[in-house]
């Protein structure tokens, strides 16, 4: 979280102003480092030098676990590519392909608000609103979309999942039935595609004026 989380912005600003990253080591596997404790944890090791002088590059190495340091992969990456922007985001690239993708991303000079688009978090926290959840459609019910409905760039509904509908009059839990891009907020590191989106087309569900989204997805 400290490398990109919003709550850690002030920490990153102080930390990376007072010091500079020299070396980052990444563990590819999340379950091998603390395998005896059965902990699934993202783990990195960093070397920081207390200085205001920015280095030209950062060394990024990676290994599968803490038992195979003899099989490291190593990259030398421009510092401005790893630590970037006014938010001091730290980008943890592991191979040349990711470096090339990052170079292309850094060329983008517009944010979503700059082009008139907003991203919001799904409206319904399902476990806090159990009384409005429904397993099947009934009179007055509207669809509740989860991350599981996002499949291969599309939004599939229904999928015979529990609690796919809600019955509510709370305006804060409903949104207009119009076209959206749904984005999964959480994906596993082991998944082949970390950014997973689905196009929601309102014309596929003309019977609804309103829909709802679970808070583990974002929508644009």
Which residue stretches match the model-derived regions?
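Signature of N6-adenine DNA methyltransferases within the class I
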Residues: 1-117
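Polybasic, glycine- and aromatic-enriched phosphate-binding surface used to engage nucleic acids
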Residues: 100-220
């Amino acid at each position: 979280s400290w490398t990109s989380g919003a709550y850690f912005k002030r920490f990153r600003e102080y930390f990376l102003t007072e010091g500079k990253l020299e070396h980052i080591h990444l563990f590819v596997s999340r379950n091998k480092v603390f395998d005896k404790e059965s902990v699934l944890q993202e783990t990195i090791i960093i070397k920081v030098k207390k200085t205001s002088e920015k280095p030209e590059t950062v060394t990024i190495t990676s290994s599968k676990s803490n038992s195979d340091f003899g099989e490291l992969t190593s990259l030398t990456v421009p510092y401005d590519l790893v630590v970037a922007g006014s938010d001091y985001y730290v980008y943890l690239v592991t191979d040349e392909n990711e470096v090339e993708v990052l170079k292309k991303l850094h060329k983008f000079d517009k944010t979503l608000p700059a082009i008139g688009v907003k991203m919001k978090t799904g409206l319904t926290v399902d476990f806090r609103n159990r009384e409005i959840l429904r397993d099947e459609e009934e009179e007055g019910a509207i669809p509740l979309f989860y991350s599981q409905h996002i499949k291969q760039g599309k939004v599939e509904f229904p999928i015979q999942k529990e609690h796919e509908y809600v019955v509510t009059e709370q305006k804060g839990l409903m949104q207009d039935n119009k076209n959206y891009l749904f984005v999964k907020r959480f994906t596993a590191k082991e998944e082949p595609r970390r950014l997973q989106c689905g196009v929601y087309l309102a014309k596929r569900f003309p019977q609804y004026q309103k829909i709802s989204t679970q808070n583990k997805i974002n929508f644009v």
